[in-house]
Amino acid sequence: FQHGGLIEEPKFLPQKIVEEKYSTKRYLWTDEKGLGQHFLTRYKKILYPSIKNNKQILIFSTLISYKKYTESNLIKNNHPFLDQNYDFFKYLNKENKNRVLIKLFPHKTSENIKKIWKKKFRNNINFAEIHSSPKVYFYNSRLAVINDISTPLYELMYIGVPFILISDNNFNELETKFVKKLKKLEKLKILYTSPIKAAEFVNNNYDTIDDWWKIVSKEKNFINFKNTLFTEKKDYINSITKELINI
């Protein structure tokens, strides 16, 4: 069962090769019958009134690694001092800065990243506990800010939490069809290459984020991209149970 994002989308992934060689059956989130969503079904959908009542802006950072570059791309958001989230936070207005909660990736390097944040912006930043589950933070957020194509993107899409993605990556490591659909999110003000423009959008639209999200989440390009991430099935438990019994 798939338990993390970005399995089918990369052009090359050792994990995929191993799974295809040694697994009898693979249940992916994109399974045509909707039998691969086991991981995602632990989440409940968020309701629009909840979004409107939430105040928090959640900055959810990707893994920043000092080595192991087979796992991390050589892009700004994987660099401890060049992460675009720094500029995004810098250009938020004072009110929005106070609404920010930063959730660093649960990894040993994150303690050092936390120190960099504090050095840049002193102690005027709220941090979530590094190894805590992101689940509660998703449901308490009016807007989530991510900087990578990874599991949080899929989780946010599934739950329905408004989010923006900031990344100047050209995504050459991903399949072309996937990237084409992803880049169409720019016109919907979801995907940004510039953290400054992303901050301007949030400053200008914070009060109406829920209304914006209600509109864009019904757009054709949004739905097409969402459908590349996972397939939903209402009677999933019954269906997967029957499937496994018959294997």
Regions found by a protein language model. Give the residues of each.
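A short helix->loop->beta-strand "cap" motif at the edges of active sites that frequently abuts
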Residues: 23-24, 97, 160-162
